[in-house]
């Protein structure tokens, strides 16, 4: 019999935990947000608050890989033709200093395939680890993330990345 939590329901609620049925999801740890010459910095943001967590994210990733936990990565990345960028999102980005798709030191900002969408080296995906490009905050909207998780028979998610009150929270909800 599984232990009870306050006599209300069995714990763990969803049955025994398994690393193979749990995925680590690394959210938006890409150069456009982390690099001093990336999109976030160009809009007046300070990427040091993001780069400061890189060592801890790298430790979590290393541990997950050691125990055989599948690892997934997300990036905020738009189509080169900008067809998935709502006008209001583009308006906000331009007001901050650089619109989505505008050229910068890392290529066109937040565009799939550009250098700014590369995940930071200390936590770069290994061959076979999926990278989910998403045009918004949630990895479940306008992407194949749900299908990838179902195909891998993932039942539980562990999150690391940026920002907790943005893309991380939107994805976990």
Map each language-model feature to its residues.
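Active-site acidic carboxylates
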Residues: 1-125
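Structural motif
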Residues: 74, 160-162
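Cysteine-centered nucleophilic/redox motifs
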Residues: 159, 173
């Amino acid at each position: 019999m599984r232990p009870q939590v306050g006599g209300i329901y069995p714990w763990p609620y969803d049955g025994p935990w398994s690393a193979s049925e749990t995925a680590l999801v690394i959210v938006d740890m890409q150069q456009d947000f982390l690099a001093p010459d990336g999109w976030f910095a160009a809009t007046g943001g300070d990427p040091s608050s993001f780069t400061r967590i890189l060592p801890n994210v790298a430790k979590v990733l290393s541990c997950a890989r050691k125990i055989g936990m599948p690892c997934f990565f997300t990036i905020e990345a738009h189509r080169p033709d900008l067809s998935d960028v709502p006008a209001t999102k583009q308006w906000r980005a331009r007001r901050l200093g650089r619109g989505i798709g505008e050229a910068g030191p890392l290529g066109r900002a937040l565009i799939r395939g550009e250098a700014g969408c590369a995940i930071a080296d200390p936590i770069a995906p290994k061959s076979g680890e999926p990278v989910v490009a998403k045009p918004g905050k949630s990895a479940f909207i306008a992407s194949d993330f749900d299908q990838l998780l179902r195909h891998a028979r993932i039942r539980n998610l562990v999150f690391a990345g940026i920002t907790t009150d943005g893309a991380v929270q939107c994805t976990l909800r």
